[in-house]
């Protein structure tokens, strides 16, 4: 018979994502930023998404957009994209990649990021791998952009923040950082074998 403590051990091996979302307005537009896992482990991959909605008359076109992040996060190549009513648009090669931000230049692309007047929302998203960040400390994120109507808009420290703790398990290292079913099954089989051989 397997004790409750042993079962709890296997249950604890699977980590679940802890997303964080904030929404705010600047009179003319509304923004929502979501981090797929705000309490990741070292080695995990997280997705940061910024959603743009226009709440006043007239469209707003973005010339460029910066996604600010802690320098201990590493951008995942080819993950930056813009999603609008027409679908997904890759941002690279028109993407500047720096230790603490990435910046998309939409004056060079074949499409524009447009906040439609009470229309469908546009989204900018990118993936990052969590490196050797300070653990147990809130690390800020934010965004910044230039547009044809609002000019320079700076929310580079708006959030949400992430708090890193520990290292990821023997899973995929994806957004959840959870252990794979195969590794859990192998561990359970070993435990059962050990219990069966005891006198």
Predicted regions and their residues:
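Serine/threonine-rich, low-complexity linker/repeat segments that form flexible spacers/stalks
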Residues: 18-58, 76, 166-174, 198
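Hydrophobic residues positioned within well-ordered beta-strands of beta-sheet architectures
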Residues: 46-50, 63, 122-126, 141
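Low-complexity, intrinsically disordered segments enriched in Ser/Thr together with acidic residues
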Residues: 105-139
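Secretory targeting and sorting signals
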Residues: 1-18
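Serine/threonine-enriched low-complexity regions used as flexible
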Residues: 128-166
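Ser/Thr/Gly/Pro-rich low-complexity, disordered linker/stalk segments of secreted
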Residues: 166-199
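Short solvent-exposed strand-capping/beta-turn motif centered on an Asx-Ser/Thr pair
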Residues: 53-57, 70-72, 133
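A surface/secretory-pathway sequence property marking extracellular, secreted
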Residues: 64, 70-111
